[in-house]
A protein has these predicted regions:
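Edge beta-strands of extracellular beta-sandwich domains
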Residues: 469-479
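Solvent-exposed loop segments of extracellular immunoglobulin-like
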Residues: 413-421
Length: 483
C-alpha cells in the first residue's frame, strides 16, 4: 500500500495557531437580519450579478453556524432573479458563497444536488433556454487562480478560485447541465476542457488527479473524445483493498493518490476561512475521510477512504453498527454520530464538540451546528464491545518429549489482519513455570514451546483485531521423557 509524506506548509501552522477555542454551540444571527445585509447593496440592473454577504461582511457570514441558515442567507428574491440576464446568473454562481461544499462531501454530486435544491439562483439559471450556451462561454473564458490570496468572493469572473472553478466543472460533470447535443456548444466545451486538462496534466507539482478528474468526467458525459486525444487512460490513482470491522465484516477501502501540497493548502485555507471558530486538527488530505476516521481508525496515520457503498454499490457502512462493536444509543452516551442526509460521520468528544474529517477538507473540531453538514437526521452510536473467546484451533502435537522444542500455530491464511498472543500454563504446579516459550512468524501466529518438566501444559492463544480480542483457543499438551 502506498504511504505518503505530507509536507505541511507554514501557512497551515499559522492558520491553526490563530484559531480561537470553540464554544459549545455557535452564536446564530437572525436570518432576516442577514438577508437584509446581504441584499441591501443599492440599485442594481439586470446585468449586475448578486453580491453575497461574504463579499461585504465576512464576519457576519462566518457567524452563521448551521448550514441551513447559510443557504437562507444566500437566497435572492424571485423578482430579482427573474429580471437578471443569464450571464449575470452565471457570474453569481461563480461567486456563490457555498461553492466550497464540493470539497465537503464524499461525492461532489451530493454538493451540487444540495445547492440546486436549496438555491433559487441555480433553479432560475437552469430554467433559462440559453443556460448551457452562456455557461460554456463564461467557463471557457475563465482561468484558474491557484494562489492562496485568491478570494472566492472577489467578483473577478475571468479568474476563478480553486473552489469556484471546481464547482463549475462538477456542475457540468454531474449532468445538471448538458450541451443537449448542440454542436457549437459541444465544440467550445471540448476546446476548453482540452486546454485546461493539458495545462493541469503538465503541472504535476500544482495539480493532482483531484483537479484532473472533473475535466475527465465532463469529457466522458459529453463524449468529447478529449482524453483519447491526449492519451489519458487512467482517471485517478486508486487502489481498492479490504479492511475489516472489529468483528471481521469486510469493508471495501479506497487508497487514493494524495493531493498536491498546493491543493491541500487551498482547501484547508478555504475551510478555515469559512469556519474560523472551528479548530484544525489535521490538514486537508485525500488519505482518509469522515467514515474511516470515525468508525475505523481515529488517527492522522489512517490511509483508508471508506464510502457508504462498496465497490459493487452495496451498502457497507452499516456493518460497523449491525451486530458488531457499535450499537445505537441516546445522545448522552454518544461516541460516534452519523448524519445520514449528508453521508458524514463524526466522533463526539467529552467537551461536547465533534471531531470529524470534512472529507477532502481538514480534520476539524467544531460545535455540533457549526459545520458544512445539517443538524437534522442524526443517528448516535456508542462502542459496545466485550472480548470474545473461543473459535480458534491450535495446530501442533499434544504429546511431546520433555526438553524438545515443538511448534504450534494458527491457520489464518484468510485473516491477514489479525495479530496473536500466546500463553502457557503448567498445570502440575503453580510455580516456577518449567518451560521456554517464544513467539514468531508473521503477526505472532507461531509459538515455539519447550516443556522442561513432565506433566500437563495448557497452551493458549488470543486473536486481536486492531487491539481488540475477538477469539481465543487452547490446547492441552502432555510432556513425558518418551512416548
Amino acid at each position: 500500500m502506498k504511504r505518503f509524506i505530507i509536507i505541511i506548509p507554514l501557512i497551515f501552522f499559522l492558520l491553526v495557531s490563530c484559531q480561537q477555542n470553540i464554544e459549545p454551540d455557535h452564536a446564530e444571527i437572525p436570518v432576516d437580519e442577514v438577508l437584509t445585509r446581504a441584499l441591501s447593496t443599492g440599485k442594481v440592473g439586470p446585468d449586475d450579478p448578486i453580491v453575497f454577504l461574504p463579499a461585504t461582511n465576512m464576519k457576519a457570514w462566518t457567524d452563521i453556524g448551521p448550514l441551513e441558515e447559510r443557504f437562507a442567507a444566500s437566497e435572492v428574491p424571485a423578482s430579482r432573479l427573474s429580471s437578471m440576464t443569464t450571464e449575470a446568473l452565471v457570474k453569481s454562481m461563480m461567486n456563490y458563497p457555498l461553492n466550497y461544499l464540493v470539497f465537503a462531501y464524499n461525492d461532489p454530486k451530493m454538493a451540487i444536488d444540495i445547492i440546486v435544491k436549496h438555491s433559487p439562483l441555480h433553479k432560475e439559471f437552469l430554467s433559462r433556454p440559453d443556460a448551457a450556451e452562456v455557461f460554456v462561454d463564461m467557463y471557457a473564458a475563465a482561468e484558474l487562480d491557484m494562489s492562496l490570496e485568491k478570494s472566492n468572493f472577489d467578483g473577478d469572473y475571468s479568474s476563478l478560485s480553486y473552489a469556484n472553478m471546481m464547482f463549475m466543472e462538477y456542475f457540468w460533470g454531474t449532468k445538471v447541465l448538458t450541451s443537449q447535443g448542440k454542436a457549437s456548444i459541444k465544440q467550445k466545451l471540448a476546446d476548453s476542457v482540452a486546454r485546461k486538462l493539458k495545462n493541469r496534466l503538465q503541472d504535476t507539482v500544482t495539480f493532482s488527479h483531484l483537479s484532473v478528474d472533473p475535466l475527465i468526467t465532463i469529457d466522458e458525459v459529453e463524449a468529447l473524445g478529449v482524453s483519447q486525444s491526449l492519451s489519458i487512460d487512467n482517471r485517478s490513482g486508486t487502489e481498492v483493498t479490504t479492511i475489516y470491522t472489529i468483528l471481521e465484516k469486510p469493508i471495501d477501502a479506497f487508497i487514493y493518490d494524495e493531493m498536491s501540497n498546493r491543493e491541500m493548502e487551498i482547501i484547508t485555507n478555504d475551510f478555515v476561512t469559512q469556519y474560523p471558530d472551528a479548530i484544525v486538527r489535521g490538514s486537508a488530505t485525500r488519505k482518509y475521510n469522515s467514515h474511516s476516521y470515525a468508525w475505523y481508525e481515529s488517527s492522522l496515520d489512517n490511509h483508508f477512504w471508506i464510502e457508504y457503498y462498496d465497490s459493487d454499490n452495496n451498502p457497507q457502512l452499516s456493518k460497523f453498527w449491525t451486530n458488531d462493536a457499535y450499537v445505537e444509543c441516546s445522545g448522552a452516551e454518544t461516541e460516534v454520530v452519523y448524519i445520514s442526509d449528508f453521508d458524514h460521520s463524526a466522533v463526539k468528544l467529552s467537551n461536547g464538540n465533534y471531531l470529524s474529517k470534512w472529507h477532502l477538507g481538514p480534520l476539524m473540531e467544531h460545535a455540533p451546528s457549526y459545520s458544512p453538514y445539517s443538524s437534522t437526521n442524526r443517528r448516535y452510536f456508542k462502542f459496545n464491545f466485550t472480548s470474545r473467546t473461543g473459535g480458534l484451533t491450535i495446530l501442533g502435537d499434544t504429546r511431546v518429549i520433555t526438553n524438545q522444542t515443538n511448534l504450534y500455530s494458527i491457520d489464518d491464511t484468510d485473516k491477514p489482519y489479525l495479530t496473536y498472543d500466546w500463553e502457557v500454563l503448567f498445570m502440575n504446579a503453580p510455580a516456577p513455570t518449567p518451560f521456554i516459550l517464544s513467539i514468531g512468524g508473521l503477526r505472532g501466529k507461531l509459538c515455539y514451546l519447550t516443556c522442561q518438566d513432565y506433566g500437563l501444559y495448557k497452551v493458549k492463544v488470543y486473536a486481536y483485531n486492531r487491539g481488540y480480542q475477538i477469539a481465543s483457543g487452547e490446547l492441552d499438551v502432555i510432556s513425558a521423557p518418551y512416548w
